[in-house]
Regions:
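Structural detector for internal amphipathic alpha-helices that build alpha-solenoid repeat scaffolds
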Residues: 2-17, 26-27, 35-50, 58-61, ...
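Buried hydrophobic core positions in alpha-solenoid tandem helical repeats
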Residues: 24-26, 55-57, 84-86, 114-116, ...
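HEAT/HEAT-like alpha-solenoid repeats
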Residues: 146-147, 191, 220-221
């Protein structure tokens, strides 16, 4: 196949005339193309699953682990592709955000040591990617393991990281998890406290209800006290429905 120009490839995408032949896409790919076009081509390869994976491997061998190629590895959903990403993770000297994002849906296969290493990173992007990985495994962990893994992210000075961790904890209903959420409601910034209250309200146990009730008098900010009252009201309705 003759080398296609950027304009020809763009025109094909605009006309929805991209062949479903992975070899065609592989041959159309070039590092000289703008990132947007390379990403579209690799995305199409990823969507071709096992057929696309063969071409993705070939392109990585030729061009290395370009971000768009690693993205394609993640979305092709092949076991061999997953193993490739896990090997890359273990072999990396420095954590690669592209590898972590590509592994997202396979978070459950990472071991606790791998997750701990990722979540201890100082990088916001890497911590958030690590929490996304953890979200696929959190239901498999004892609450002590889970709390240990989210300990560093929950102490992060960036609200976005802490809130991501809170959203993982709110899927659990153990007393230790509820206690940690209560601490965040008391000691965190306004957005963190607000999210912690929402998490406590969504858990729906008698213990979480008691902690919310205590927070109503312990919180210093009136708006947060009102939000705690609202969560308590919602939870009381939920508990009444369960009991009846």
């Amino acid at each position: 196949m003759a080398t296609l120009s950027e304009k020809e490839i763009r025109d094909r995408f605009n006309q929805k005339n991209i062949p479903k032949d992975p070899l065609w896409i592989e041959q159309a790919y070039s590092k000289s193309l703008p990132y947007e076009i390379r990403h579209l081509l690799c995305e199409r390869l990823g969507f071709l699953a096992d057929k696309g994976w063969t071409s993705i491997k070939s392109l990585i061998k030729k061009h290395g682990g370009q971000p768009e190629l690693i993205y394609a590895v993640g979305i092709c959903h092949q076991i061999e592709a997953r193993d490739f990403l896990l090997n890359q993770l273990d072999e990396q000297k420095d954590l690669d955000i592209n590898i972590l994002k590509a592994l997202a849906c396979w978070g459950a296969v990472l071991n606790n040591s791998q997750l701990e290493l990722i979540l201890k990173s100082k990088s916001q992007a890497i911590r958030i990617a690590g929490l996304e990985l953890l979200s696929f495994k959190s239901h498999l962990l004892h609450e002590t393991e889970l709390l240990e893994l989210v300990n560093e992210p929950l102490k992060d000075f960036r609200d976005e990281v802490v809130i991501k961790g809170i959203k993982i904890l709110q899927r659990r209903n153990e007393d230790a998890v509820i206690d940690r959420l209560k601490q965040l409601a008391l000691n965190g910034s306004y957005p963190i406290a607000e999210q912690a209250l929402i998490a406590l309200g969504s858990i729906g146990t008698k213990y979480s209800s008691r902690q919310i009730s205590e927070l109503i008098t312990q919180l210093d900010i009136k708006e947060l006290q009102q939000k705690a009252k609202k969560q308590l009201s919602v939870q009381d309705i939920f508990l009444d429905r369960i009991n009846n």
